[in-house]
Amino acid sequence: MFRMLAKASVTLGSRAAGWVRTMGSYQLLVPPPEALSKPLSVPTRLLLGPGPSNLAPRVLAAGSLRMIGHMQKEMLQIMEEIKQGIQYVFQTRNPLTLVVSGSGHCAMETALFNLLEPGDSFLTGTNGIWGMRAAEIADRIGARVHQMIKKPGEHYTLQEVEEGLAQHKPVLLFLVHGESSTGVVQPLDGFGELCHRYQCLLLVDSVASLGGVPIYMDQQGIDIMYSSSQKVLNAPPGISLISFNDKAKYKVYSRKTKPVSFYTDITYLAKLWGCEGETRVIHHTTPVTSLYCLRESLALIAEQGLENCWRRHREATAHLHKHLQEMGLKFFVKDPEIRLPTITTVTVPAGYNWRDIVSYVLDHFSIEISGGLGPTEERVLRIGLLGYNATTENVDRVAEALREALQHCPKNKL
């Protein structure tokens, strides 16, 4: 065989000869990893943290379906059904509605990269980690970033936002509907109309709230909204949902400069997802299996009905709050009206280390809960009731685990 290749190299010239020599000149320095000789093993756990969440059986089954080409007609039909599902859960008729092949962070960047240009004034509500992240991304773009900073656990009023709009005259306002790091749900009624009076677009992050908390993109005047797959939707992490209305689309398509990212350029993604009615154009290879799962998760919500889904989360969370109050735990968010129904934050009880509690619940009950994030790190425990997991049975399980953890975890009496 080698003689045949060597003879061919003489015929083809020096380039081919170099290729033949390369094939035989090097030895493998890295052996096959021993770990990969063993079958993959994953523990069985109840995921009651801020996400990801457990997959419903139907969604899990979708992940094992056969692979098909990402631009074949059958896949394009699935993509069309996903778009319709997003329009339902977003409550929007926006044609420019699609999936971003990346996590919620990628959706945030997709929105900001496409809407902001260097020098644009950008106003963000920073009452948790996600406002901080939005400010960081906008700063990297070269926007003039203005933050309305509030204490974690607080929300924004129309008056406060209007003062920011009048002072900074932004082209874009960013608000988080469900702030997963603090457990706050931000009221949205009136904010879209207010922004439009000041010629400003409203961008809303609904990653931790979509499907579990009422939100109406069109009726509430939200110009751009995004969410993610792994929380209430109960799909695998790694893809996100986004929608632009006509005002936001005009801002994107009338840019003076190209977006800083080719991968998240919405003008290309719109063609890939058939949002303009034209022949679809390949931009990147979409995550086919993840889209199968997302399609099924959206179908489950459509079958259940949004109002029923919202009610189930509200009832399960009320049941959880009752247990927490009986244990003497204190809610991090003082105002009951702005407590996020999908993710509850409780202050770490005095004398306890949050890591001990989280570890005990995991080790003894195979239940995942979480500590704080960003401004709430070391300060809170976070308990998530997301989609398929939002049941009173699961609440009773995690309440039992917490009670036992508080009895057995070391407590500093000083």
UniProtKB/Swiss-Prot annotation:
Modified residues annotated as N6-(pyridoxal phosphate)lysine in this record: 231
Organism per entry: Mus musculus (Mouse)
Quaternary context: Homodimer.
CDD domains in alphabetical order: AGAT_like
Disulfide bonds: none
Protein name: Alanine--glyoxylate aminotransferase
UniProt keyword list: Acetylation, Aminotransferase, Mitochondrion, Peroxisome, Pyridoxal phosphate, Transferase, Transit peptide
Entry keyword Acetylation: yes
Gene Ontology molecular function terms on file: alanine-glyoxylate transaminase activity; amino acid binding; L-serine-pyruvate transaminase activity; protein homodimerization activity; pyridoxal phosphate binding
Entries under Pfam families matching the protein: Aminotran_5 (PF00266)
Residues with N6-succinyllysine modification: 247, 330
PANTHER family for the chain: ALANINE--GLYOXYLATE AMINOTRANSFERASE (PTHR21152:SF40), AMINOTRANSFERASE CLASS V (PTHR21152)
Residue(s) carrying N6-acetyllysine: 247, 256, 330, 334
